[in-house]
Structure formats: C-alpha cells, structure tokens
Design a protein with these regions (language model features):
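Non-heme Fe(II)-dependent double-stranded beta-helix
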Residues: 1-11, 16-109, 114-117, 232
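Non-heme Fe(II)/2-oxoglutarate
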Residues: 31, 38, 42, 46-49, ...
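Short, charged/polar surface micro-motifs in flexible loops or helix N-caps
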Residues: 76, 86, 101-103, 121, ...
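Generic beta-strand structural signal
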Residues: 87-89, 93-94, 105-107, 122-128, ...
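Short, structured patches in soluble enzyme cores that scaffold and shape functional sites
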Residues: 95, 111, 128-132, 141-143
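Glycine-rich phosphate/pyrophosphate-binding beta-alpha loops
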Residues: 112-114, 123, 203-208
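Short, conserved beta-strand element in jelly-roll/cupin
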Residues: 117-134, 188, 196, 220-223
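Double-stranded beta-helix
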Residues: 135-202
C-alpha cells in the first residue's frame, strides 16, 4: 500500500498518500459533479442560506454510473480491506460533501456511528478529496477516540438531539481547551490522497473561506463483524424497510450493501422492497 501517515490501531485515523491514480481522481470528480447536478431526495444543505453552500447527498452509487465504476474499479475497497484486516468488505453507503468557496459553516465535532443502523468494530469511513485541501480546512480527528465512549449526536445547524433523548449519552468535551487529553490530528491533502477513519472516531472540518471548491466523496465500508442494528429513530442516511428484511444482529448481507472486496460479479435478477 502507498505511504501511510498515522497509526490505525492507535489513532483510529490514517492518511494514505498517493492511493489513487489521476484517472481514479478524475472519475471520482465526475461522480461528485454528476451527483451535485442531480441531487437525490436525501440531499441537504448543511449551511445557512446566506453562507456559501455546504451540500451533502447520500446513497447515490446505484444511480450515478461514474460513482459505481469508481467504487468497483479503483483501489478503495482493497485499501479498506487492508486497513481493517477484513476478509470481506461491503459498501455501506456513499456520501458526497461539497463546500463551495466562501462557506463559513464548520462540520462540528461528531462521531458517525451513533447516526447509523449498524453495530460492530470492523468498519471504515474513507474521505476522498478531488481538490487540494489545505491543513487549515482539512478533516481533523481526536486521536484514539475510536475506543469510545459514544457522544451525543446533534444536528449540525441547530445542535438538536434528534436521535437519543437528552442526557442519555455523554456530551462532547471541550476539545480545544484540553489538547493534552484530546490530541487533534489531520493532514494537508492532495488529490490522490485518502483519509481512513473508524466510524467511532471524533472528527470535524472547518468551513471553506478560500476561492477553491472542496469536493469530497466519502465511502463507508463494513468489515467482517458488522451487523444490522435497527434504531427507534430515522438514521442518517435512512434505509426505509430494511428492518423488515434484516433482523437485529443479522449480517449486512443485502443487495443494498454489496460486497466490494474481494471483487464479485453483481447479482442478477435481485429484487428488494427496501427503498432505493
């Protein structure tokens, strides 16, 4: 594998330098642009109307041909398998994040796993920028926070607790005021670099005050021990109807979550009642 900055087991986040070829990056960029030009009903604006534009969309791989091609032909799944030490890797979902120039809105500190309908320890989120990302606006992590605990997930714009009742989880600590207790790591990135992090690792990102776009494709991967964990609330992203098809504790063996490593031919003639 390419040069690695960081330690996965220790930090819960690493940077893989030069992981993707220029052709891979160009394909990912086309996928992002196609997605932004044709947003799904799951898309949202995560910034105020007067503040640039921070656009997110989810679960587009099955309708954006360039995205599916990137996932299946680039080395991203092999990298995920190598980092996790997994024998089988499934795609959980894709997530497009675009911060246009002049966007002040930060992505606040959060963990991904509390928003999801999965449990287990072998998982990986991959952050794939197709534009240069200066250190000042890159994704940052609290090293070692993948070991827990869970912190209260809140909405990004108005800090509402929509997923867990108030008081049921610990609130986020003051990370900036306690750098020795919560060491922050992050990397300046060039197209071709990818950042891998555990779904329980605390992370944040600044706005994009500069003149260039910050386009990112983030892919979420599931390893060997990940199982379905139906929630009493609407997850982000949602998977309507899935709890009727996969019981709690079942492996994520479902057409919505295809095996991407080792490579397998797509199933034919498979139907599902789960909403696409």
């Amino acid at each position: 594998m390419s040069d690695i900055d960081g330690d996965w087991e220790r930090d819960g986040a690493i940077c893989v330098r030069g992981a993707l070829s220029p052709n891979d990056v160009a394909l990912a960029a086309r996928a992002i642009d196609a997605n932004v030009a044709d947003l799904s009903p799951l898309a949202k604006r995560a910034s105020e109307s007067a503040d640039g534009a921070f656009i997110e969309d989810f679960r587009s791989w099955s309708r954006i041909a360039d995205m599916e091609q990137f996932i299946t032909t680039s080395p991203v799944a092999a990298i995920a398998a190598n980092v996790m030490g997994a024998t089988t890797v499934r795609l959980f979902h894709d997530h497009v994040l675009v911060k246009e120039p002049g966007t002040a809105q930060r992505t606040p500190w959060h963990q991904d796993i509390p928003y999801y309908n999965v449990d287990g320890t072998m998982n990986l989120s991959m952050w794939i920028p197709v534009d240069p990302v200066p250190r000042a606006i890159t994704l940052e992590f609290v090293a070692g926070s993948h070991r827990g605990p869970w912190y209260m997930p809140r909405t990004f714009l108005d800090a509402q607790a929509r997923w867990f009742p108030e008081g049921s989880l610990a609130e986020l600590p003051d990370i900036a005021a306690n750098p020795d207790q919560f060491p922050v790591i992050g990397w300046e990135l060039e197209p071709g670099d990818v950042v891998c992090f555990h779904m329980q690792t605390l992370h944040t990102a600044a706005g994009n005050p500069g003149p260039g776009r910050r386009r990112v494709l983030s892919l979420r991967f599931l390893g060997d021990d990940m199982v379905h964990a139906p929630r009493a609330w609407t997850t982000s992203p949602p998977f309507p109807g899935l709890k009727e098809e996969l019981p709690a504790g079942a492996s994520m063996d479902h057409p919505l979550f295809p095996v991407v490593w080792p490579p397998v031919p797509p199933p034919s003639g498979t139907t599902s009642s789960v909403s696409e």
